[in-house]
Amino acid sequence: MPPRLRPGSVCSRCHFHRRSLSSTAFLAQKQAERPPPPPEAGHVRLVNRALISLTGADSTSFLQGLITQNVVSAKSRASPTTPFYAGFLNAQGRLLHDTFIYPTLPEENGGNEGMELGYLIEVDKEQVTNLLKHLKKHKLRAKLKFRALDEGERGVWAVWDNAKNWETKDTGDVLREVITCADNRAPAFGYRVLLAGDNLQNLSQPLPGQQASLSTYTLRRILHGIPEGQDELGRESALPMDSNMDIMGGIDFHKGCYLGQELTIRTHHRGVVRKRVLPVQLYNTEDPKPMPSSSGIPVYSPDSQLLLPSAGANITKSSASGKGRSAGKFISRIGNVGLALCRLETMTDISLTGESSQYNPSEEFKISWEANADAGVAEAGEVKVTAFIPPWVKDYILHGGTRQRQTKEDVHRAKSGTEQIEEED
């Protein structure tokens, strides 16, 4: 008989770790939480992100063994100088942290660690302690130091300008108080900028647009289908490809051994990613199914008065009786738009195996809930939901992404590796 779970806990087999329902779980969001549509240009201080400093002679090789992206250049074997997006996995290949990695100059690290570059690791602020524990667990005898940066040491900013591809001239090797990183998780999504403190005066040119709220950045991210932070990426349960980390440039499938690589490579070369995080739009049950915007993403309405489901709610077919089979999991939302983990062949017209698809364009999907006095939900409710595939995501899935660039040697090496893994299993 399986052990009983404590009230409010989550089974380890559940795909997403979610909080228990609260009394406000199904209430319409407050107006303050529903920002206006994102401006064409703007900048936001990301107070929900934090930085960890990693320095030392072994810092590059240490990171190389822990993250999904290739730290060392395959040709020159040199340490990187350009920031990049990457993930930390556990030994089972499940996602622990989504991060941006910023190489720093030796002088910034005090000049006492030889000529090895140091690194700043940007991570979900709520996960700093967990990532520090993860680094400490794998440090062993490596010559390195790590610490969480104090509040105010450096600020993380998101910057965008839809009218032009903004890029500051103040790169890390010109002005050490400023480090920039192209955010390539979606086309023309913008930049990350690290500033010493929050002093915008350090920049030789102003950031584009006006300073906006964190909810504005979150809305823009949701519309582009970008999950961020462990509330959205399913810590220790989701595969990195489920959260589109491959599409967003966070995985190097040609890289050598790193923690969690086996399942990642096996899924890439021999498996099919059947579920992915997609942007979704919510609408009332009596309303017609919404159409995407001209750019293929949901249409946001700041005036929406929908009753909203909580994170982790099941998505089912509207025609299904009772609970029905899950077509996806709702993740997060602002107003009438959000993110959901969707079964591609059920909720979209994507065919993964070349066989007949389960998708029916006339089919609609719903999220239903029942009254729960203990949770403060006075009455039952239901909203409909439709998923959208941003054009760059669809193109990657249909054309195989990086698989198109595999050589025969890559395929043979992957096949040999996965056969060995299966023998060990």
Swiss-Prot record:
Residues of the transit peptide: 1-28
Stored Gene3D superfamilies: Probable tRNA modification gtpase trme, domain 1 (3.30.1360.120)
Subcellular location: Mitochondrion matrix
Annotated segments matching region Disordered: 403-425
Lineage top rank: taxon: Eukaryota
One biological process term in Gene Ontology: iron-sulfur cluster assembly
GO cellular component, as recorded: mitochondrial matrix
Family: Belongs to the GcvT family. CAF17/IBA57 subfamily.
Name of the protein this chain belongs to: Iron-sulfur cluster assembly factor IBA57 homolog, mitochondrial
Organism per entry: Coccidioides immitis (strain RS) (Valley fever fungus)
